[in-house]
Amino acid sequence: ELAAQTGLCRTVKVLAGLHDSNAALLAARGFDAIAGNEATILSTGTWFVAMRLPGAGTVAPVLSEARDCLINVDAYGQPVPSARFMGGREIESVIGIDTRRVDIIPDQPALLAAVPAVINSGAMMLPTLAQGCGPFPMREGHWLNEPGDWFERRASMCLYAAMVADVSLDLIESQSRLLVEGRFAEAEVFVRALASLRPETEVLTANAHNDVSFGALRLIDPALKPNGDLRRVQPLDQDLSAFR
């Protein structure tokens, strides 16, 4: 009946759309190191969504709905333990949307250089700026020793995002391997802080076209592979244990 009404061939495939974070999950599975292995994808944008792909035989963790954890379902109907917080919105609420982004590539050396001053001064944003969301939904965000320098301010917010992401990853019992994708994968203070906070985890980013559009394309052709490789992220030079 639908074919008759539309004039489409009876053999045409109709594909339903999927959420961008779910498309990111499909894109990540294009890498051999991720597909079929215990791994977590941290998709970063307005929302930071951590999605764990449990290894074979792994028992799913008990998740806390009150701390913004849930079981998502991937494109193939499989359960995906997940946790989320509004990391991008929180960062932008402090530093602005366009003028002082934390992921501007030419600014990365200066942002990394600002980290020691942030740690030494005790500058820290406490959660939560987007109240009602994330692992600390009832807390009210505020500064400790608010920095005046804009590089230090931006570096502080990257450390804040890494700290909250670290807690969210613990809540879904993330382990072994973590691929950070999306806009904030280019924020070196953020990804390197994650590598520092999770020394037992292989923290990765991709130098390939592996965004959500590629993930949606893999829904049509699951055999597609990314045109690049994964990069292992090195920890920060500074010790974050006291800061944490």
Which residue ranges define each predicted feature?
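Short His-centered aromatic/hydrophobic patch
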Residues: 1
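Active-site core segments that coordinate phosphate-bearing ligands/cofactors
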Residues: 4-179, 186-244
